[in-house]
């Protein structure tokens, strides 16, 4: 015979891993081709000159240069090539 009553399992104890979203490179910083600038869900930041957008809306640099952020009705991120 059991000496303890049966205990129900807890329904807690689950959590999802963080996705590490956000801006990875600030304005004025140097970047190389292929560098990830922003990881996002949706288009909170939009690609401008010399910036590509991946299928998961990640923004990345298409050329070596310096990051520029511009805010009008939307926030745009571009990369200005460095002058030699």
Curated annotation (Swiss-Prot):
InterPro entries: Ribosomal_bL27. One of its GO terms (molecular function) is structural constituent of ribosome. It comes from the Bacteria. One of its GO terms (cellular component) is cytosolic large ribosomal subunit. The keyword Ribonucleoprotein applies. Keywords: Ribonucleoprotein, Ribosomal protein. The keyword Ribonucleoprotein applies. Coiled coil: none annotated. Gene3D superfamilies: 2.40.50.100. GO terms for biological process: translation. Residues 1-27 are annotated as: Disordered. It holds the Pfam family Ribosomal_L27. SUPFAM superfamilies: Ribosomal L27 protein-like. Belongs to the bacterial ribosomal protein bL27 family. PANTHER family: LARGE RIBOSOMAL SUBUNIT PROTEIN BL27M, RIBOSOMAL PROTEIN L27. This is Large ribosomal subunit protein bL27. The gene is rpmA.
């Amino acid at each position: 015979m059991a000496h303890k009553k049966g205990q129900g399992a807890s329904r807690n104890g689950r959590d999802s891993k963080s996705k590490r979203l956000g801006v990875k490179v600030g304005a004025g910083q140097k970047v190389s081709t292929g560098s990830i600038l922003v990881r996002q869900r949706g288009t909170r930041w939009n690609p401008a000159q010399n910036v590509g957008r991946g299928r998961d809306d990640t923004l990345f640099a298409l050329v070596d240069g310096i990051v520029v952020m511009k805010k009008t009705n939307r926030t745009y991120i571009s990369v200005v090539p460095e002058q030699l």
